[in-house]
Amino acid sequence: GAFSSKPNTNPSPTIGKELVYEGYAEKGPSINIGGYPAGTKGARFSIYSMTDGKQYGRGTFYLSCLVNFSKLGANGMADFLGLSASYVGGSNRANIYVAREGSDRIRFGTSLLKVKAETTMAYDYDKTHLLVLKLDYANQKVSLFVDPELSAEEPAEASCIAEGDAENVLKHAIRALSFRNRSGFIGNVGNFRWCNSW
């Protein structure tokens, strides 16, 4: 950053190309994932505060976005988006993950605190995917839909579901969206939508 002896080792996110998914209404530029100088390791968080209140702490909420990855730098599931209970970030209640599947495919996953779930299907690199993350406070579930049918009705089955337990309870209100820019990754994320209905 600007106040380190090695400026720009973990750069701020930059504006990327517009992502398009047929039937999805949200438009505009994306955020570049990656862009670190060669040899740089680590990650940088950017926090996008939504509220300092508790209005997003009961009922059901949906975060949707478009993503397109051309390279993944980590082995295993790596988070890149999170919903935080803190106005300034941290304390994520739910995350969206991505992982390599062999040499030419990727998988996605989600979490409810420490409970994780992964998709059984694999998806293509260099293709724009629609992700819809559902937080269901009443039923203690976080669901991830990957490339769902865009209709008025929520699909009957999610791509993966993380269910709460005695130690992992969805109870704190969401106050911010957290983006984790990782070294070794190349891609884009954007076209966000936050709402209380499908």
Give the residues covered by each predicted segment.
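Predominantly extracellular/luminal cell-surface or secreted proteins
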Residues: 62-64, 84-86, 143-149, 195-197
